[in-house]
């Protein structure tokens, strides 16, 4: 429980961006060997956000979902899917909007974002290995007029329609 809370604090304060790194740092800081599950960390993160942000979280969630809808409408030809904390309804002050899209050509998505006035701040290819299989996707980050951040991930169209398990819940 202490490790989950410490990892959640690291995520909430943006000292870490990913659950895996937050859990490793928490274990190191507390000198404990057992890693909590992502669910345990997520529950603690939700408690912290509720304690610190209260009702303003609901307003934040509504605003971010409206922004996500605008982005998704701009990218409708690329089968956008809202994922992450905005989709789950567990946003906090440092949350970003995460959207998956599907295309063979990431430039098409970058061009569409720019056409709709979104200013991309960074883009990169990312690779991960899950269950022995390497997977690559293209990630674009941008800041919205509200100050919120968004990330659009371009995935291979072959992945469209595949069911994926949430790594947190």
Where are these regions (language model features)?
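Catalytic core of pol beta-like nucleotidyltransferases
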Residues: 1-16, 20-93, 103-169
